[in-house]
Design a protein with these regions (language model features):
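Short, glycine/charged-rich "phosphate-handling" switch motifs in NTP-dependent
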Residues: 418, 739, 757
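P-loop/Walker A nucleotide phosphate-binding surfaces of NTP-dependent enzymes
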Residues: 2-348, 355-361, 365-370, 392, ...
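H-loop/switch region of ABC-family ATPase nucleotide-binding domains
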Residues: 406-408, 727-728
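Walker B catalytic motif
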Residues: 345, 376-377, 664, 694-697
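Conserved beta-strand-loop-alpha-helix hinge in the C-terminal portion
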Residues: 421-446, 745-774
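A short, surface-exposed alpha-helical micro-motif characterized by mixed small hydrophobic
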Residues: 413-414, 733-735
Length: 779
């Protein structure tokens, strides 16, 4: 059997590994967080393949200049590698499922052929939302527009105007905002002590929308000084739009973005195209109708549609296009993405959905002898859906490719041809090859449920109507741990967002009524969205403790002698940073058709700061040392600084002690990003009466990590916290859940129905539940 032979791999924390990975087989790499899985798969195998490819196509050592060579002795029999990860470098809102899979291009060709005749020819790009001649001039083909939301501007209509019912005018009694409101009320004869609910429609219109451009002399207090100047009296909405005109949401105007929301374009109704373009039909439907159809419905429609204009001369071309579309749709549906539609923007997909879209694209690709790198392909998938991703992986193998996947899911691992386990722990002490097997063992479990607790207080949300959820009622125990379950697209994330928005009083129109929950002080949503997208965003900056760390360095005798203040230790301000890389430690190499690449700054060697700043030490550590050492190794340095110590301790409790404070946020996995957010929340929040909403917190964790995380959740519960978790891991659910809300086995438009809710054992025994008979399995 031919293998990829890796010798002396020592990238990051890898301990000079020597191993072989079989070609044309399916290999799973597993282990605890920070044990070296990504260092082996992405930073060694994939990075060397990419570097060798660039070097090969340029015909010289140009590739070596563009990319750093991985720390490895040699890699033999390495094939071209394709990274199908959770992150996707093209996050342009114009990138859709249709464009990424190329289905939209086939569909445009189909429209052009059918609508062309001997007298007139229709161009394919006439149906493109990127074509200025075709797209809606108001939204420029995005299908949405940003408007000021009345519900965000006035979250509570039972508050008086004087007390800040309209948030834009909220301020102290002598503030500019309050005086502006008083002037508006005086000019239009409105009682400032009225509640918004008591205002007439005309009065509310005058406060929100009037734009008479009346000049008014305003006297107000700013700090300790009293100021006077002329202002233009206008309602809150035109005032906000004036601040953010041109879509500029820079630092000076971002404060007003909280009042804005995206809604379908009022001109095109979300179709993205001009009216004249929508007059062209295919089988009685226009282009937008088809792009808005769920993929599973589109598959049935495209297979059976008829159109009288398809003549014999067109029939062959139409048949080829239809077959190509059906082939690509089938691949998407097989990966349980049938609830999506072609016009769904790529940035709005979850990491798991994006990865499955890309896998589906590869299933219809004719390339062979590739190495596919998959990053937790089971993430976001219910047990019943994982068999589909296993079949897709095996299809890639049958086509003559090699698959190397980082995964923790036992069902997926048991289907592989080879398992590589790294460990034994994360961070500097990890990176060892613990086990390699070419005959994965059968894995099973028998669930042991958490002890049943009694709850007397519940909060209830009645008649929920949002996205695919219609008329559903829920109740959640105060002080309990509630798990939301169901297959992909069934409504889990939608329900979680409803809960968050209802407690933040943002959208009263998405539910009928809410009962209970008055004692919940704060809602803390903790999702897997990236916490940063540039090298400037780091773990330490997100945790909010870098100011304190810089202040400690500025107080040292050496810094005082050099007259270095705290800003000299900032990566974002001129003075102390390396100006060659502007404090990032990296230089970005931009490619037109590949993700951006980063190489170590040749001047500072990745240390981010100039030599003067690096000569300053705090507790025998430079600022570079602090940023580059694992949290486990530096926490004792800050044991006398309560806020820093608390944040670092929370990171270690959540199994993130292997991370470095200077690690770029964009390099964190979704699971790591979520736990960093949770660590920040734990270190900043006062305990008791908070509501935590978590999105698949076990993603990226092995059994050891999960056990640690369970202890964190149970300790939070003991402090009277209420926790809501979207989750698929049935073993985790059984160990932590006091209550389950299940959406069943149907996703998309037919989903959104709560089929079971109650005690875990009750839901697991409910035949309609997605958890039915999953309390004991062998695979």
């Amino acid at each position: 059997m031919e293998t990829i032979i890796i010798k002396d791999a020592h990238e990051n924390n890898l301990k000079h590994l020597n191993l072989e990975i079989p070609l044309d087989k399916f290999t799973c790499v597993t282990g605890c967080s920070g044990c070296g899985k990504s260092s082996l798969v992405f930073d060694t195998i994939y990075a060397e393949s990419q570097r060798a490819f660039l070097e090969g196509i340029t015909g010289n050592i140009f590739g070596q200049k563009l990319m750093n060579k991985p720390q490895v002795g040699s890699i033999e029999n390495l094939h071209p590698a394709l990274n199908i990860s959770q992150t996707y470098y093209n996050m342009n809102p114009r990138s859709t499922i249709g464009t990424v899979t190329e289905i939209s291009y086939y569909l445009r060709s189909l429209f052009a052929i059918v609508n062309s005749d001997q007298n007139s020819s229709v161009a394919e790009n006439l149906f493109s939302s990127n074509n200025p001649k075709a797209f809606c001039p108001h939204c420029a083909g995005l299908g949405v527009e940003t408007v000021v939301s009345e519900s965000l501007l006035i979250p509570d209509r039972d508050v008086t105007l004087r007390d800040g019912a309209i948030l834009y005018f909220k301020g102290s009694s002598e503030s500019k905002e309050q005086k502006y409101l008083e002037a508006l009320c005086e000019h239009y004869g409105i009682d400032i002590d009225k509640k918004v609910s008591q205002l007439s429609n005309n009065e509310l219109y005058q406060l929100l929308y009037v734009d008479d451009k009346i000049r008014y002399k305003l006297t107000y207090k700013e700090g300790k000084r009293r100021k006077q100047h002329y202002v233009i009296l206008r309602g809150a909405v035109p005032a906000i739009l004036g601040r953010v005109s041109g879509g500029d949401l820079s630092a000076s105007t971002v404060a007003y973005a909280k009042y804005m929301e995206e809604v379908p374009c009022h001109v095109c109704g979300g179709t993205k195209l001009r009216k004249e373009v929508l007059e062209y039909k295919l089988g009685g439907l226009n282009y937008s109708d088809i792009e808005h159809m769920e993929l599973k419905l589109l598959y049935s429609w495209i297979a059976t549609f008829s159109d009288d204009r398809i003549t014999l001369s067109k029939k062959e071309f139409v048949g080829q296009l239809v077959n190509s579309i059906l082939c690509k749709l089938k691949a998407l549906i097989q990966l349980d993405l049938g609830y999506l539609c072609l016009n769904r923007s790529i940035p709005t997909l979850s990491g798991g959905e994006r990865q499955r879209v890309r896998i589906a694209t590869q299933l219809t690709c004719s390339l062979k002898s590739l190495i596919y790198i998959l990053d937790e392909p089971c993430k976001g998938l219910h047990y019943r859906d994982i068999t589909k991703i296993i079949k897709a992986t095996q299809n890639l193998i049958r086509r003559g490719n090699t698959v190397i996947a980082i995964e923790h899911n036992k069902q997926y691992i048991s289907s592989s041809d080879c398992v590589i386990e790294l460990g034994p722990v994360g961070g500097p002490d990890g990176g060892y090859l613990i086990h390699q097997s070419v005959t994965p063992q059968k894995i099973g479990y028998h669930l042991v449920f958490k002890r049943v607790l009694e709850f007397h207080d519940y909060f209830k949300i009645n008649r929920i109507n949002f996205r695919n959820i219609h008329g559903q009622n829920i109740r959640i125990p105060i002080g309990g741990i509630t798990c939301i379950t169901g297959v992909s697209g069934s409504g889990k994330s939608t329900l979680a967002s409803v809960i968050v928005r209802c407690f933040s009083r943002k959208s009263d129109n998405i539910y009928g009524s809410i009962e209970g929950g008055q004692n919940i002080r704060r809602v803390i949503p903790v999702n897997q969205a990236p916490i940063g997208k540039t090298p400037r965003s780091t773990v330490v900056s997100y945790l909010g403790i870098f100011d304190e760390i810089r202040a400690l360095f500025a107080k040292t005798d050496t810094a005082k002698q050099m007259k270095l203040n705290a800003s000299a230790f900032s990566m974002n301000i001129k003075g102390g940073r390396c100006e060659c890389c502007q404090g990032t430690g990296l230089q970005k190499i931009t490619f037109n058709y590949l993700p951006n690449s980063y190489i170590t700054c040749p001047k500072c060697g990745g240390k981010r700061f100039n030599d003067q700043v690096l000569s300053v030490k705090y507790c025998e550590k430079t600022i570079h040392d602090i940023l580059e050492m694992p949290i486990l190794n530096i926490i004792d340095v800050f044991k006398e600084t309560k806020r820093i110590y608390s944040a670092l301790h929370s990171m270690i409790e959540l199994g993130l002690g292997y991370l470095k404070l200077g690690q770029m946020s964009m390099n964190l996995s979704g699971g790591e990003a979520q736990r960093v957010k949770l660590a920040k929340a734990l270190s900043c929040s006062s305990y008791g009466k908070n509501l935590y909403v978590l999105d698949e917190p076990t993603a990226g964790l092995n059994d050891t990590d999960i056990d640690k995380f369970i202890q964190i959740l149970l300790s939070l519960q003991q402090r009277c916290e209420t926790i809501i978790i979207i989750e698929h891991n049935v073993e985790f659910i059984a160990k932590v859940a006091d209550y389950i809300i299940d959406f069943g086995v149907v996703g998309g438009g037919d989903g959104g129905k709560i089929v079971a809710q109650g005690l875990p054992k009750t839901v697991f025994n409910d035949k309609a539940s997605s958890l039915y008979r999953l309390d004991r399995l062998i695979y």
